Structure formats: structure tokens, C-alpha cells
Regions:
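Charge-rich, low-complexity N-terminal segments
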Residues: 3-89
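A short acidic/glycine-rich loop-to-helix N-cap element
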Residues: 149-164
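Short, highly charged C-terminal tails/helix-capping segments
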Residues: 178-191
Length: 191
């Protein structure tokens, strides 16, 4: 037992002597990290732009014309589809919504069961949320929604926004295909 303690003490002494005579590179790394942090803070101070203004500028850069709605949302058209964006100045995240991406009659019970199953599956597996609402008319409307980070430090932010928008189109395709698969499976079961 005494040999174990002596061995540990000898190791500690040798390590401290080695550290004393050799330059420790970890301190240089710390100064490099501090310089990087200082540079990033300088960049963020230069790019102090509100989230809403960043959203408006980015929407214009992807070739769409942003418009303000009565609910303080940003409405724009991208590839023939109207989107709504909720961007608040004191928040680094935005909500993007594709309203009325799919609709059906609220009296069609079979369709409602199919859509409910598909919506639940999509919400479990995807990065977007699909929600349904009952409108004043006899329709049930499906909306696709996504909440994501939107800050000036994101490189190629126009491509980033296009990528987020493409998630909506992919989800809408999946939604239509899965609903159709459910219809076909029901028809096969009745035959």
C-alpha cells in the first residue's frame, strides 16, 4: 500500500518538473479561443439587425415580395404557394406557415380518419408540424408549420431559407402520398 502512495507521489513530482521545463501549449490555445470569441462579438455587433428585418431582406433576396398582414405576419409567395412568417425582433427564431396546404369536408369521416393517422405519423417523424383546423365553412384545413433559428450568423441564409421552404413541399408530397396509400389499402380490404 505504501508503494502505491509513493508511486503516485513520484509521478506527480515528475509531471510537475516536466511541466516546469516544457512550454505548455494549452495556454496558447486559450488565447486563440479568446481572440476568436472577441472577433465573433465584433462581427455580431456589426451585424446588429432585427430578426424581422433580416426575414424581410432574405425573402426579397430569394425573389419574393414580402407583405405585412393585419396580424403582423409577413406574407410572401414562393413557387406559387403563399407562406406566412412570424418574425419578432427580440426572438432569434421564426415560425413559417403554409396555410391550407390540404383540405377536405368535415363530414367525410373516413377521410378525417385517414388524415388524422397520416398527420400523427408525419408529426412523429418530421421536422415540421402538420396541424388541422375546422374553418367556418364545411372544410377541415391542414397547415404545415415550422419553427427554426434565423440569425445573421447563418452562412448563405438565402439557401437556408430555401431549404426550410423545400421541407414544406416535401411534407406536402408525403401527406398526399400517404393519404392516397390509406385510400388504396382501404379499397383492397373491401375487395
Amino acid at each position: 500500500m505504501i508503494w502505491h502512495i509513493l508511486g503516485i507521489l513520484v509521478f506527480v513530482v515528475i509531471y510537475n518538473i516536466w511541466r516546469y521545463y516544457h512550454k505548455d501549449d494549452s495556454y496558447e490555445y486559450c488565447s486563440d479561443v479568446q481572440d476568436t470569441v472577441d472577433n465573433n462579438q465584433g462581427i455580431s455587433n456589426m451585424e446588429a439587425i432585427s430578426t424581422r428585418q433580416l426575414a424581410l431582406n432574405t425573402i426579397e433576396k430569394i425573389g419574393s415580395e414580402p407583405q405585412d398582414t393585419e396580424e403582423a405576419r409577413i406574407q410572401f409567395e414562393y413557387q406559387g404557394v403563399i407562406f406566412l412568417m412570424e418574425a419578432v425582433n427580440d426572438c432569434a427564431f421564426v415560425n413559417l406557415i403554409w396555410p391550407w396546404c390540404h383540405s377536405f369536408s368535415k363530414f367525410d369521416i373516413d377521410e378525417f380518419a385517414r388524415v388524422r393517422q397520416v398527420v400523427n405519423d408525419i408529426n412523429l417523424q418530421d421536422t415540421v408540424s402538420v396541424v388541422y383546423t375546422i374553418a367556418d365553412s364545411d372544410d377541415v384545413a391542414l397547415h404545415i408549420r415550422k419553427n427554426f433559428l434565423f440569425i445573421p450568423q447563418i452562412p448563405h441564409i438565402e439557401d437556408y431559407l430555401k431549404l426550410m421552404l423545400n421541407d414544406f413541399f416535401r411534407t406536402a408530397r408525403i401527406l398526399e402520398l400517404e393519404i392516397e396509400k390509406c385510400r388504396v389499402q382501404e379499397c383492397e380490404q373491401h375487395i
